[in-house]
């Protein structure tokens, strides 16, 4: 009997570095065009979003720099790990995000990749502005103080 594809067993790959290096101004969920071996690798959790970003080319939005590892059982018909992948958006969303992405200092960054309830791969894109060094330090201080408070609350 085959195992059902529930929410619990589907991997969620998050770009934790993006939360540290960027202020997220807006979020958008979009689909991604993948090959079969890429989907299998994603289900195994073999993905790196460290160097990934979104790029607007003409009327399309592309995910560039995402590294989906080759699927070992796909031998001859395997995919190229770092190829650009087309993101699937509605035309209104695409135009709105493309116009905002062309503003100075804004970048499209993939925040996470996951499978929805229907088993389709989705990308959560963020419209982000880079943090300055003092902003990063402030974020680290807040996280440290929150951790200390949580630790103290657990002791009581």
Regions inferred by a protein language model and the residue ranges of each:
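Ribosome large-subunit tunnel/peptidyl-transferase-proximal elements
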Residues: 10-106
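Short amphipathic alpha-helical patches
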Residues: 62-66, 120-125, 146-147, 151-153
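Beta-rich strand-turn-strand
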Residues: 89-126, 130-132
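Flexible glycine-rich active-site/ligand-binding loops centered on an Asp-His dyad
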Residues: 130, 136-153
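Switch/connector loops and helix/strand junctions flanking conserved nucleotide-binding motifs
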Residues: 71-73, 122, 133-135
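C-terminal low-complexity, charged extensions that often adopt amphipathic alpha-helices
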Residues: 107-112, 150-152, 156
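Basic Arg/Gly/Lys-rich low-complexity intrinsically disordered segments
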Residues: 1-16, 135, 142
């Amino acid at each position: 009997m085959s195992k059902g594809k529930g929410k619990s067993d589907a991997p969620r790959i998050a770009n934790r570095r993006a939360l540290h290096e960027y202020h997220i101004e807006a979020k958008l969920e979009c689909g991604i065009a993948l090959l079969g071996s890429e989907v299998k690798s994603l289900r195994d959790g073999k993905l790196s979003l460290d160097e990934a970003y979104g790029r607007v080319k003409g009327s399309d939005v592309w995910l560039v720099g995402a590294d989906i590892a080759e699927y070992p059982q796909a031998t001859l018909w395997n995919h190229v790990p770092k190829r650009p992948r087309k993101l699937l958006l509605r035309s209104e969303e695409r135009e709105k995000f493309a116009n905002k992405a062309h503003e100075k200092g804004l970048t499209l960054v993939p925040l996470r990749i996951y499978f929805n309830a229907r088993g389709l791969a989705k990308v959560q894109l963020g419209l982000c502005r880079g943090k300055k060094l003092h902003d990063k330090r402030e974020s680290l201080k807040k996280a440290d103080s929150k951790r200390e408070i949580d630790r103290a609350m657990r002791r009581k």
